[in-house]
Amino acid sequence: MFESLRVPVIAAPMAGGPSTPELVTSVVRAGGFGFLAGGYLTAATLADQIHKTRELAGESFGVNLFVPGVRSLVDVTSYADRLRGEADRYGVAPGAGRWDDDGYAAKLDLVVERRVPVVSFTFGTPLVADIERLHEAGVTVVVTVTTPDEAREAATAGADVLCVQGFEAGGHRAVFTDDASSDSGGPLLGLLSALRLIGAETDLPLVAAGGLVHGADVAATLSAGAVAAQLGTAFLRADEAGTNGTYRAALDAGGRQTAITRAFSGRPARGLENRFLRENSAAAPAAYPQLNNITKPVRAAATAAGDPEAVSLWAGQTYPLTESGPAERIVARLAEQAREAVSAAARRFG
């Protein structure tokens, strides 16, 4: 599947708005591949996006789903109380700290029914029975992993491809189990190290993800054993991305460091530092998606007000190097940069 791409670049699934059928289509037209983000969407909305993407891009697309985790028993009441002042600032109340499975079963049924060409999973490995259902429908199954242990689990369950995520990545870390004793939720492996270590454990094709915004980055991951590179942050400012105006303005302005935090969702995720992140990270428990539901009204109100200080501004470490413009142009530039990087490296070795 990914080995045959004319340009080995994949538009990563970015839940919450940035991933759109138009973004996927633009990347596909440039020779790459694109994912829709099923996370946080209803099955009906996802069905509409699948239909539209198929009309525009044919079969060169996939859908990403979040694997439901074990229900956390952590009491999130005190965290909700802590945020009342922040919520008052925007004239809203904190949301209910409920657990849910993001409509996983309905969305899994949908991608099987629609025979989506590729389905990727984040936050764990789906049940073997679910993978078998997908295979029976002709679906290629991708599991996102961060460590060799996770890679072995995914391979044993029947995954066809592993998406290897380095700690440089923007958005949620894909760790299978969120280790509450660690601010990062688990071991922090850089992308190239993770590719080498996981590549030594399996013969499955590897897709590289994590802080990739330049063609030289893409070339480096291919040299480290990946068959393609998956980029999210690089496309956040693309014309076709659904990145909201407040989010775009913060990316355009630059000047902020990135940090990993549980403050917004209860799961470790990398984003631009802002007031909410600084003031609440230390107090945020490992309770996903309860915290995501608690903070949702605050994030929505801050976004509507154009205030980036209480919005989850997910982005990888290298976000200052991103550019705006059509996604096709971004992919073409990545390809040219990769070719130049390979040629320059070859010259260094005579």
Language-model segment annotations:
Residues 1-201, 334:
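Active-site entrance/lid segments in N-terminal catalytic domains of soluble metabolic enzymes
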Residues 169-207, 212-350:
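Conserved active-site-proximal phosphate/metal-binding subdomains
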